[in-house]
Amino acid sequence: MDEETQNQALQDIFGPDGLHARFVRVPIDSCDYSLEEYQAVADPIADPDLATFSIDRDRKYVLPMLKKAIEISAEPISVLMSPWSPPYQWKTAPKIAKNDAAVYGAMGMPVPEEIPQRNHGGSLKPEYYGSWAKYVVKYLQAYLDEGIPVTML
């Protein structure tokens, strides 16, 4: 979306003559409706201390829009950080194959087999409960450090 269209959309949603939206939900890492799968640490097994944690992708795509929305809004905006799915390395295998029609429906867009199944099922393994908690806190702190008024998790 070009910058002019982005600005108009933000005005229509958050601006004084728009919808006056005051709530934004931001997924932690990719989610089912993301254009691609991504996570803030490439290999959390090799990096259990999360030393390589980075929200650079968010800085490029998410944070600029959030900051514009906050600037445009006449009222404070509440931001909900939504943990969607832990890194795939910490999860069990999904029960349904990611290209199965039960996942996306008969018209679902196929997901290439080489893409890990981060958002397509499976459960967090108990041995990673503490790691996932640290990951979420790290994400929350990174957004607070960027000046985003996260009020809910």
Feature locations, PLM:
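N-terminal catalytic cores of secreted or lumenal carbohydrate-active enzymes
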Residues: 1-150
